[in-house]
UniProtKB/Swiss-Prot annotation:
Protein name per its UniProtKB record: Translation initiation factor IF-3
Swiss-Prot/TrEMBL keywords: Cytoplasm, Initiation factor, Protein biosynthesis
Subcellular localization(s) per the UniProt record: Cytoplasm
Gene Ontology CC terms, in alphabetical order: cytosol; membrane
Record's compositionally biased regions (Basic and acidic residues): 191-217
Chain spans, region Disordered: 185-217
Predominant subcellular localization, coarse grouping: cytoplasm
Superkingdom of the source species: Bacteria
Assembly: Monomer.
Length: 217
């Protein structure tokens, strides 16, 4: 059984146990989860002592306060674990801005940023705002977003296709499980250069194909 004390999980949260509980009467829950009803604080403390356990105040603002008879050490560990799990579950979201006329070099930089974030388990949201007459280039903007899906498939995935909302197009990526994430753009310089050259060649091929199509038309 622990001495009278308070467990501080952070600056705002604490738990009173045993003789530190101030209420004169408390609603007591035993170690099996059964309610023992409202008892004088002395009797509640005695029952906990008889079982070699602690009286822990779990709902201090209830009327009367609710206390449980349990192993304080295990209770403290459980609280600590929940806090850690909660922090892990709070996935950070990083936002990246794009421009419809972005050049290949800047596009590669955006890919590297997104890949680095997702490699760390962070979500990434791309935003593209069409200014003024750029609204007439919706097809280019959507193609750019669809290209992102292909270029980042090795590290993340998106739940829905990019859609235009007013003048803004957004696309959110969720990182793949850690054991399935691969690096493509954040590699040693020699490998990155090779990939950059491959992307340039692909872009040239697309431009040439587009020009030939216009000639035929």
């Amino acid at each position: 059984m622990h001495p009278s004390s308070r467990f501080h999980s952070n600056k705002k949260t604490f738990v009173r146990i045993n003789n530190a509980i101030r209420a004169k009467e408390v609603l007591v829950i035993d170690s099996t989860g059964k309610s023992l009803g409202v008892l004088p604080i002395q009797e509640a403390q005695q029952r906990a002592q008889q079982q070699g356990l602690d009286l822990v105040e779990v709902s201090p603002h209830a009327h009367p306060p609710v206390c449980k008879i349990l192993d304080y050490g295990k209770f403290k560990y459980s609280l600590s674990k929940k806090e850690k799990d909660s922090k892990k579950g709070a996935t950070k979201l990083k936002e990246i801005q794009l421009h419809v006329n972005i050049n290949e070099h800047d596009f590669l930089i955006k890919l590297k940023q997104a890949e680095a974030f997702m490699a760390k388990g962070m979500k990434v949201k791309f935003n593209l705002f069409l200014r003024g007459r750029e609204i007439t280039h919706q097809d280019l903007a959507l193609n750019l977003m669809n290209r992102l899906i292909k270029e980042l498939a090795h590290v993340g995935q998106t739940d829905q296709e990019p859609k235009l909302a007013g003048r803004n197009i957004s696309l959110t990526f969720t990182p793949l499980p850690a054991n399935k994430r691969l690096l493509k753009y954040n590699l040693p310089e020699t490998e990155t250069t090779r990939i950059r050259e491959e992307n340039r060649e692909k872009q040239k091929e697309k431009e040439n194909t587009s020009k030939e199509g216009n000639k035929d038309a």
